[in-house]
Amino acid sequence: VKFLAITLVAHRPDPVTGERTSTHQRFREVLDSARLAEELGFDGFGVGERHERPFISSSPAVVLSHVAAVTRRIRLFTAVTTLSLLDPVRAYEDYATLDHLSDGRLDLIIGKGNGAAQRDLFHVTPEDQWARNAESYDVFRRLWRQDRVTAATRFRPPLQDAEVWPRPFQRPIRVWHGSATSKDSADLAARHGDPLFSANVTHPIEPYAELVRHYRERWEHYGHDPARVAVGAGTAGLHVAPTSQEALAAYRPVFEANRAFAEQTGLPVVFETLEDFAERSSALIGSPQQVIDKVHRYHDRFGHTVLHVQADAGGLTASRHRASLELFQAQVAPVLRRDIPDPPFAWEPVLPFPAPTQETTRV
């Protein structure tokens, strides 16, 4: 199993202390988190994309380019990049450039994105967002794989024998499809033979397990080898401590503050108590053995081989968050790496693709 640390780069007051860092300092924290993730042995570091408050992750390609410059080994992920909002040509140019700057360490997780404010900002409607996502990915995928592309498009000017530069370092690149609430993303991933990444954050396991089950069914429907299927899954929070009592005591102020924030902003409160949250959500809060057992329970339902945890302290003190990550890597990760297989593909950077030939593939 592989482990990612991800951030959506939320920028709001600390849920416990109420203190708020500057925008500049928040970005420096992201870079510090990436360095720490590599230092502790995480396999990937992800940056989300949001275009509405309280997030400042509107340019993940730019942030990940800086992360690439301050790291050497760890793979870099978009978590997710919102192709339904973007021109696929510009998205391709940005990520092909990042692919080179990172020496081929880039993985993409794509999705339609969440939030009415960012849909309004880009003039995307709930009715057309899925069609936009599918079309943008189709064009993006062709641009990455082919030297010239012709495509009749609905949501951007059509392409006619188009060349787009730079050509990528990895060819093809691995693209995951983020899945939170809809079978559309699961079906799109299965259709193209791409891996699925379940958000697995807001609710108990059942709706996410149903989407993963649907993805596996559609994977076989489209004729792909069941042995090549790959699933990733997120977590709603992380705090590992020597004992469950210590973990719950440290996390309780975080949970209470987050629940109060949800109530104030009109968000649904799914878990009323910390104990219920620790038991029925995907959050990994407890002793090392409790965390190991919980990941196994989720693996029994998902069959996932990649797991993401939160890179941000999120209300914990910096020292307590680091201690949690260190304990996770020292006592949790080795056991899970032994028990759960790796994804069915190489994780390391691949060799550059040979130079383009004069032959052109038409679409």
Predicted segments, located by residue:
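Active-site mouth loops of central-metabolism enzymes
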Residues: 13-27, 81-89, 171-181, 279-288
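Alpha-helix-loop-beta-strand connector modules within alpha/beta enzyme cores
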Residues: 54-78, 132, 136, 326-340
